[in-house]
């Protein structure tokens, strides 16, 4: 069984990863990567995911440590760096990397869902709709992955 504190750390780690994805898509839009409409839609989804996760974090009375906030800032900037590099790649290769990254994101959220189901003292899980939100995020990340897979061909 997973304790509340272990879950909290996993949850915050997921938020930090989402922050890097936001940086990547922001950079690609800045460098006018095409198809712009797809990148903009996915960026909006990633921002929404992060907002939902942070809202849940605060609803639990949790907060970020200074180190976690610093890591979030670092990840946003590293996302910009990665996104800038991706912008220089041929489109199909760029789309392949996005396909793999979105697939990995869906797997990470799936791991988070498994952690929720293995937490000791699950009263708060039943009183919130976090499982529904995470399932929607998983479906969304899988959809992003499929979009990029289609763009590869």
Language model region names:
Residues 1-153:
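Non-heme di-metal
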